[in-house]
């Protein structure tokens, strides 16, 4: 869990920036978006297969160039 200790002379904006960076590194926002709506396992599997196919095509195109 990200947390930031704010020093007396430290501006709030800087502390907020540090907190946002820690949240991004921890992957909290992406996890929240992912869990916002329930996704059936079959749909997850389809999306995973489509992503794998896209990666393979991209890799293949890169090899040709």
UniProtKB/Swiss-Prot annotation:
Pfam family, one: Ribosomal_S21
GO BP, one annotated term: translation
GO CC annotations, alphabetized: ribonucleoprotein complex; ribosome
InterPro entries in the record: Ribosomal_bS21, Ribosomal_bS21_sf
Keyword check for Metal-binding: no
GO molecular function term, any single one: structural constituent of ribosome
PANTHER family linked: MITOCHONDRIAL 28S RIBOSOMAL PROTEIN S21, SMALL RIBOSOMAL SUBUNIT PROTEIN BS21
Protein name: Small ribosomal subunit protein bS21
Species: Geotalea daltonii (strain DSM 22248 / JCM 15807 / FRC-32) (Geobacter daltonii)
Phylogenetic lineage: Bacteria, Pseudomonadati, Thermodesulfobacteriota, Desulfuromonadia, Geobacterales
